[in-house]
Amino acid sequence: MAKAKFERTKPHCNIGTIGHIDHGKTTLTAAISKVLHDKYPELNEESPFDQIDKAPEERQRGITISIAHIEYQTEKRHYAHVDCPGHADYVKNMITGAAQMDGAILVVAATDGPMPQTREHVLLARQVGVPAIVVALNKCDMVDDEELIELVEMEVRELLTSQEFDGDNCPVVRISAFQALQGDEKWTQSILDLMDAVDEYIPQPERDLDKPFLMPIEDVFTITGRGTVVTGRVERGVVKTGEEVEIVGIHEKTQKTTVTGVEMFRKILDEGRAGENVGVLLRGTKKEDVVRGMVLSKPGSTTPHTDFEGQVYVLKKDEGGRHKPFFSHYSPQFYFRTTDVTGTVELPEGTEMVMPGDNTDMTVHLIHPVAMEDQLKFAIREGGRTVGAGRVTKIIK
């Protein structure tokens, strides 16, 4: 079997299945894989159910998450699809962003309708900025009453609208993932209809390359006769020799400088692109003016802040987290991109304390400014070990 070449010709999109336990998320993931494999065998391998269900554990920022990654192609797009077997894995994945989602397929069993985790996943999807949701109304082969299915569909649309998604217009596709896996023709077609809806309704994400340049600085050193070099992995955008950039964060003032060279593996490049580890040579910048934790960015594209609201998952003791709860005025380190900055936590009114395993909102004040934007991820650490993971939900100042 020749190794398939990753074709860059199709736009790429990251999606995931969300929804209540036992409503058929993993069965649907397997069904999509099988149906697309049968329709486009040269484009798609098949991922069987048990392979997805026994998802490998991944460690993200010291948090163990079981997550299954599969890929498949429709005629229009290349997809990376994530499925988490356990509910706790979902919550952790959504908050830590272990697997980014450009859109989600909400699986709701027509036999049950929306359940508590259905609501929780939709709320999480909104909080973490998932732009669009397509609904897969599953197990429709088990419901004979058309009115009952219509009722469930109405409930799901209302739920989506209540969480600021477009409940009126989002596609709701009636499927049976189990029957599609068995090869039933009618239900196989329902899976193809679902993927057509995903192709059409989930917007094409802006590629990292097209976003404004940003590189978190990992290291700084001097090359005699040439100046100061900062190294790191380009998070987004492109940086070219001769361009003006800003150095943002940690210090009160943002510095402006010009890129005089870009290097990768000791080779001189014209530019550094998203995803690449590069060294960037800066004109007239002193080594002592730059520290790890700052970012190099396109002028005006990111700003330094000290106060923000965040949503945080607090690790349980058996995940290596704290053994005891914490209260307001707790002062751990907040790890943004490449560095720790001490911050003080204020819990929301009515929340006395936060226990290991909780999911909470908090307001944080950092002692140094950090280049940040909405949805930026961070870890909470104590003495170098991760005790929580979160993302910025609102910048205060």
UniProtKB/Swiss-Prot annotation:
Region (G2) residue spans: 62-66
Ranges for region G5: 176-178
Region (G1): 19-26
Broad class of where this protein is predominantly found: cytoplasm
The enzyme's E.C. designation: 3.6.5.3
Binding site for Mg(2+): T26
Keywords: Cytoplasm, Elongation factor, GTP-binding, Hydrolase, Magnesium, Metal-binding, Nucleotide-binding, Protein biosynthesis
InterPro entries, alphabetized: EF-Tu_GTP-bd (IPR041709), EF-Tu_GTPase (IPR050055), EFTu-like_2 (IPR004161), EFTU_2 (IPR033720), G_TR_CS (IPR031157), P-loop_NTPase (IPR027417), Small_GTP-bd (IPR005225), T_Tr_GTP-bd_dom (IPR000795)
Region (G3): 83-86
One matching Pfam family: GTP_EFTU_D3
Residues involved in GTP binding: 19-26, 83-87, 138-141
Subcellular location: Cytoplasm
Reactions listed under catalytic activity: GTP + H2O = GDP + phosphate + H(+)
Record's keyword annotation contains tRNA-binding: no
Role according to the record: GTP hydrolase that promotes the GTP-dependent binding of aminoacyl-tRNA to the A-site of ribosomes during protein biosynthesis.
Subunit structure: Monomer.
Family of this protein: Belongs to the TRAFAC class translation factor GTPase superfamily. Classic translation factor GTPase family. EF-Tu/EF-1A subfamily.
Name the record gives this protein: Elongation factor Tu
Organism: Cutibacterium acnes (strain DSM 16379 / KPA171202)
Gene: tuf
